[in-house]
Amino acid sequence: MKNRTAMYDFTIIVPVYNEEDNIQAIEQQLAGYLPHALRPACVLFVNDGSTDKSLSLIEEVCRRRPDFLYITLARNGGLSAAIKAGIDVTQSPLVGYMDADLQTTAEDFNLLLRDIDDHSLVTGIRANRKDTGFKRLQSKIANGFRRMMTHDGAEDTGCPLKVLHTSYAKRMPFFTGMHRFLPALILLQNGTFRQVPVRHFPRTAGVSKYHLWNRLVSPFIDCLAYRWMKKRYINYSIAGSNLNER
C-alpha cells in the first residue's frame, strides 16, 4: 500500500529522541528549505521512543504542515533503528536524513542532490567542525579505524547529512551502528558514493545523546560486526525472468 511519501521525489528522515527544545527550530528550518529543494521533498520525523514532549510537538507540526509526516517507534532503538524504520516506510525515489540537533542545515541537501543522479549515495563532510577538540579527536580515531577495516575511503561517516537512492537503501543489511557504514554498505552493492563538504554548527539547544562509549568504543565493535557480515553478504542481480509474461 502506498503512503504519502510516494507523492514526492525525496524524503528527508529526521530521527528524534528527546529533542523537545529543537522541534520548533527544525520545523522552521525545513519549512524554509522545502520550497526551493532541488527535488519535490517531504519531511519524515521518526520519533525514537522519546520520553519528553517531542512526540506531541511533532504531531502539532504535522497537523499544520502537509509536507511533514511522522512515525513513532514503540521504544527507543537508537539512531540506526530510527533510520531503518524511516527507510522501510519511504516510497519516494530518494531518501536522506539529518540529525535533529541542527548542527547541519537542510539547505545543504541541495549540494548533495546535485550529484545524486550519478551516484548511489552522496554524503556530507563536516567542514570546520564546531565540536570540542576532544570530540573531533574521538571522531578522527574512529574514522581512521573504520577506514582501515572497511577500505571504503570515506572521510566522515559521522556526518548526519546524506542522500541515497531508496532502492539501494532498502537493500542494505542493517545492524546496530550501521549508520557509520553507509559508504561501505553501498560499495558492497557495487554502488558508488561521493563526498561533499557541508557546513557545521554548534548545538544551541538540547543535549548530545553521545558519549565516549558510542562515539569511540562502540564504532570499534561495530567494525568487527561489519567485517563478519561482509564475508557472508549475498549480492546478486537477476539476468532474466518470465515473471511479467502472460
PLM features per residue range, with description:
Residues 1-131, 167, 193-194, 240-246:
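Structured catalytic core of nucleotide-sugar glycosyltransferases
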Residues 1-8, 144, 151-152, 175-246:
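Hydrophobic helical membrane-anchoring modules
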Residues 13, 31, 41, 59, ...:
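Conserved protein kinase catalytic domain
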Residues 50, 75, 130, 134, ...:
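Residue-level signature of the cytosolic catalytic core of signaling kinases
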Residues 88, 135, 162, 179-180, ...:
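Residues that recognize and position ribonucleotide moieties
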Residues 119-170, 221-224:
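Short, flexible, basic/aromatic active-site loop/helix in glycosyltransferases
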